[in-house]
Amino acid sequence: MTTHNEAWQSHFTGRPTPDLTLHPRHLSVVLDEAAGTAPRREALRFQNTRMTYAELREHAERFAAALRRNGVQPGDRVAIMLPNLPQTVVAFWGVMKAGATAVMTNPLYRETELTRHFRDAGVRVLITLDILWQHIGPLLETLALERVFVTSVDDALRPPLNWLYALKRW
């Protein structure tokens, strides 16, 4: 019988060597490379929405430009408080391309966790979901945010699902 360690170790040919050469680069280069080598390959899928690597890079670059127009500077900390949506991926890569730091934030956090998390990280800007506003709105002064970007689930959907989502919320 093969042990757990033997099973995965059989895939490795040797030990890592201390002379391993690392090539440090900015994380946003990874998206650029993926979009350059496989622009039409599907990068993400959500309900009836599909996005290629080229489209993801384009959305990320546009969002990065919007962040910069709204005062986000390299090194700023931007909280991304979203569930698993295409906007989460676009926001992350947009923050990277703007040179800022993404502070991934659990959308289930409430007042105590948000206040501690944002203060500890030095968050200046927030990207969140409209249905979370009821928890964020009352904390705006406490959190000392300079900007808040709000999106909706239906922003990630194509017809007819975006229409149905809007009707359901109404």
Language-model region placement:
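Short N-terminal helix-initiation segments at or just after the protein's N-terminus
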Residues: 27, 92-99
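Structural core segment of the AMP-binding/adenylate-forming
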Residues: 69-70, 97-170
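Conserved AMP-binding/adenylate-forming core of the ANL superfamily
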Residues: 21-23, 32, 40-85, 89-93, ...
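Short low-complexity stretches enriched in small and charged residues
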Residues: 1-4, 80-83, 102-109
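Residue-level signature of the cytosolic catalytic core of signaling kinases
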Residues: 23-27, 128
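Flexible, non-catalytic linker and terminal segments flanking ANL/adenylate-forming cores
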Residues: 1-24
